[in-house]
A protein has these predicted regions:
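Short runs within selected transmembrane alpha-helices of multi-pass transporters and secretion channels
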Residues: 55, 126-145, 151-163, 179-195
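Hydrophobic/aromatic residues in alpha-helical transmembrane segments
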Residues: 18, 22, 58, 99-100, ...
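Short alpha-helical transmembrane segments in multi-pass integral membrane proteins
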Residues: 1-6, 62-129, 170-206
Length: 211
């Protein structure tokens, strides 16, 4: 239990640090942009609620089937979860893009045109990268369920580094759009790392299903 719980706790802590760094970068653009970014982040969190739920389910699923020695079920379950990621990401992206202006209004009363534009800039960029975000939840939790907690923990460090690097590199030439891209870059790099790690673990440490 500790081998799963400790990496999860560290990941949440690292993610919180990354969020604070990102918020600090946004603060320099003024109160209206800060309000827009905060509201857009809340909208994104609402739109992606299926992803952490799916991830938690996969952690339990992989752990139970690993303990039972049913590796074929792990393969099938993770394959199905991979395809579910497309559905979850597509639904989240559509919700952010189509209902984004209305949902931003839930958190900002009568937002100005500038504020709404800034919020939608973040949501449009985030929507493009919802798929790797879904991968993070599924494969990070799946690997932890398979008692492979090191890489999921290190993936949090990569996520933090990616955000910080994009903020340093892209903020000056691209301004607020560069800051909005920090989450997207973190999701993409971390999602790819976790998929590659799962593929390596599944084909080197698990018994391949017979056909």
């Amino acid at each position: 239990m500790l081998s799963v719980g400790i990496p999860m706790a560290l990941n949440y802590s690292i993610t919180a640090i990354g969020t604070m760094i990102l918020q600090s970068a946004v603060n320099v653009f003024g109160s209206s942009v800060v309000a827009a970014f905060t509201a857009a982040s809340k909208v994104s969190n609402i739109a992606t609620q299926t992803m952490p739920t799916l991830g938690t389910a996969m952690a339990t699923y992989c752990g139970q089937n690993l303990g039972a020695g049913k590796h074929d079920r792990i393969f099938r379950g993770m394959k199905d979860a991979f395809y579910l990621c497309f559905f979850a990401a597509g639904a989240a992206a559509l919700l952010c893009c189509l209902a984004g202006p209305t949902m931003v209004g839930w958190f900002i009363h009568n937002p100005s045109e500038q504020t709404l534009h800034a919020a939608m800039q973040y949501l449009h960029i985030a929507s493009i990268f919802m798929l790797p975000l879904a991968w993070i939840f599924v494969y990070r939790n799946g690997l932890q369920g398979l008692d492979r907690g090191l890489v999921p923990m290190l993936s949090g460090v990569l996520e933090l580094f990616s955000r910080y690097a994009v903020i340093l590199i892209a903020t000056k030439p691209f301004g607020y759009v560069g800051v909005c891209s920090a989450d997207a870059a973190a999701w993409l790099t971390t999602g790819i790392l976790l998929i590659v790690t799962y593929m390596t673990v599944s084909y080197t440490h698990l018994t391949l299903p017979t056909t």
